[in-house]
A protein has these predicted regions:
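Active-site-proximal beta-alpha core segment in soluble small-molecule metabolic enzymes
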Residues: 1-155, 190
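C-terminal active-site-proximal or functional interface alpha/beta core segments in diverse enzymes
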Residues: 130-205
Length: 205
């Protein structure tokens, strides 16, 4: 059902990759985000055509994948239109920008053709400004990466975020407002980032 609806599969190890394959997931619909090096899982992910999601050099695969998303450490508090995003604590996940740039250059030299940036805050944020604020930080980081190394980002992974409200006194985020904010942001992207692919996994936590 989920595959038919256009969803993807986020896999952490070989067992989850095999399950995704059995359900018919393949290609960019599979994201492989390893927690530790695993040669067998890396090979299976490569055979599936998965996008590798890497949060540091400690999980760098033995051979550069066709496509990789590098996770950026949050660059200060999330803000949108000058206001702080409520319910989104500062996260230490991901890489500092300098380390990310080095890893991007290494992957590119090794043959990675499609490069992405992502942010994984792992929080059930109920503010519709969450994804637009993450998007803004990734756009800024992508611009600096291109300026420093000439590499162009093709994917933005906005990570997890929205949960489902089960309390009438705590309404969930306005998804239409979030979508409209993201649409407006994509309309102002620099030429090099036009057509960037967006992915996100709301509710996965």
């Amino acid at each position: 059902i989920l595959r038919g609806a256009g969803c993807g599969a986020l896999c952490r190890d070989g067992r989850e990759l095999r399950l995704a394959a059995a359900c018919g997931f393949a290609g960019p619909a599979v994201a492989y985000a390893p927690m530790r090096p695993d040669a067998a899982a890396e090979q299976l992910a490569r055979e599936l055509g998965a996008v590798f999601v890497l949060d540091g050099p400690q999980v760098l695969p033995a051979f550069a994948p066709e496509a990789a998303v590098l996770l950026l450490r949050q660059q200060g508090p999330l803000r949108i239109s000058g206001r702080p995003v409520m319910g989104a604590p500062v996260s230490s996940a991901g890489m500092e920008e300098a380390e990310l740039c080095r890893l991007a250059a290494c992957l590119h030299a090794g043959g990675t053709r499609t490069l992405g940036l992502g942010m994984s805050l792992g929080d059930l944020c109920m503010d519709e400004g969450f994804y637009p604020a993450v998007f803004a930080q990734l756009v800024a980081a992508a611009a600096r990466l291109r300026e420093k190394s000439g590499l162009t980002v093709r994917i933005f992974d906005l990570g997890g975020g929205f949960g489902v409200s089960c309390r009438p006194d705590c309404p969930g985020p306005d998804l239409s407002a979030c979508a409209e904010a993201l649409r407006a942001q994509t309309c102002t992207l620099p030429e090099a980032l036009q057509g960037v692919q967006l992915s996100m996994s709301p509710g996965r936590f």
